[in-house]
Amino acid sequence: IADNAKIMTLRIHPGEGEPYLKDMALAIRYAVNHGADVIVLPEQNSIYPKEQKQWVSEALKEAEKKGALVIVPVWDLSVDMDKDEFFPNRKMNKEGELTNFMVVASSDKNGNPVLNTNYGATTLDIYAPGTDIYSSYMGDTYQKGSGEGMASATLAGVAALVKSYFPKLTGSQIRDILLKSATSRKGVEVEKGIRVDDRPSQDLF
């Protein structure tokens, strides 16, 4: 999507189980201190110990101050996130709601939510294409993949494209542009269902 973007890979997943939240917080700080404009985190989780939640919250606030956009995909649990809280989220910081933070879920080719995705009228920001996405794979090959990870990568690509045309935009401003240029999905079952459509963003150029 954004051909000239540079990718910074920071591994925080141990290979099995869930990522260590201290490593996630340190990775966020490292990324923003080394010029990252768009940060993609692992899927949200419902288990966030209080002290570790504070580490991540402070790192996210630092990313907001440095002008980076932070994207996190939902889990595939068919859970209403307005009723069951998942982390990280934009309301977890004591200083106020994060303005640079986006929660994304996967949509199919028709822009509808995929089966089993988490949802929420106030806690989910946007849907992005995440079904049958052709991407790089192991062994210098390419193949199609589906899932929330693909959706977050799609959203990150569009955000990077906007940033490449307007480098002075902050993460908060890019978030606002993406939300306002998304295609409305009022007819679907999930409330406030919208998906990424990069064409309205491109029309700005």
Task: Report each predicted region and the residues it spans.
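Substrate-binding/access-modulating region of protease and related hydrolase catalytic domains
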Residues: 12-98, 140-152
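Extracellular S/T/G-rich loop segment that most often corresponds to the catalytic His/Ser-adjacent loop
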Residues: 65, 91-164, 168
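Active-site-proximal beta-strand/loop segments in catalytic clefts of secreted hydrolases
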Residues: 2-5, 10-14, 28, 41-46, ...
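Subtilisin-like serine protease catalytic core
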Residues: 1-21, 99-100, 110-111, 119-123, ...
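Proline-centered loop/turn at the N-terminus of a beta-strand
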Residues: 6, 37, 67-69, 102, ...
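C-terminal subdomain of the subtilisin-like protease fold in secreted/lumenal serine endopeptidases
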Residues: 36-41, 100-103, 166-205
